């Protein structure tokens, strides 16, 4: 888990409210979402893999380019990246990320990132799809590896996704069908966005 900013506040309890000094606790360091689903919800793990006929470094560059997700958003949908403690933005560890719009609010913090191998995004409690009473995503992870048939002349990449969500128990089937439709073309979007230089 990536630590959120922490701090300590020194107070003098002898100070009176008239001085303008108020008691203030430290910024908390806790998991972004509860470890167990709330009552009436179950843990759902949706996974999907794609075989992409592009080099792994280029698939990684596409996956970790903010413009891949920012460009093309139609208002009022919006994707934001806010700087981490080191002043970095984009896909870097500790960067705050939000994808918001009608019927959705996915807000979280980027976790461990290993170049060309792994990317982690952990969602904050309160994130939801369609309704907070139905679908509450908690984590989105991607893994990359060379494709099983990858060669130096014809490179390919296996891209694997895992989305962890707390789902209303009665709506698990609906969620799985929605995810199958939503993610179906993700791999082909990636492939079309990267020029197939190995064919040229």
What is each of the regions a protein language model found here?
Residues 48, 159-163:
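Short, hydrophobic/aromatic-enriched beta-strand segments in well-ordered soluble domains
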Residues 59-69, 96, 110, 121-125, ...:
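Hydrophobic pocket/interface hotspot
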Residues 45-46, 78-79, 92-94, 124-128, ...:
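Short structured motifs
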Residues 7, 12-18, 87-96, 116-128:
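Short, hydrophobic/aromatic-rich segments at coil-to-beta transitions
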Residues 12, 71, 100-156, 164-166:
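Hydrophobic-ligand binding "helix-grip"
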Residues 2-88:
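Hydrophobic ligand-binding cavity/cleft-lining segments
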Residues 164-200:
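A conserved amphipathic terminal alpha-helix motif
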Residues 33-37, 96-97, 127-132:
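Short, P/G- and charge-enriched loop/turn segments at secondary-structure junctions
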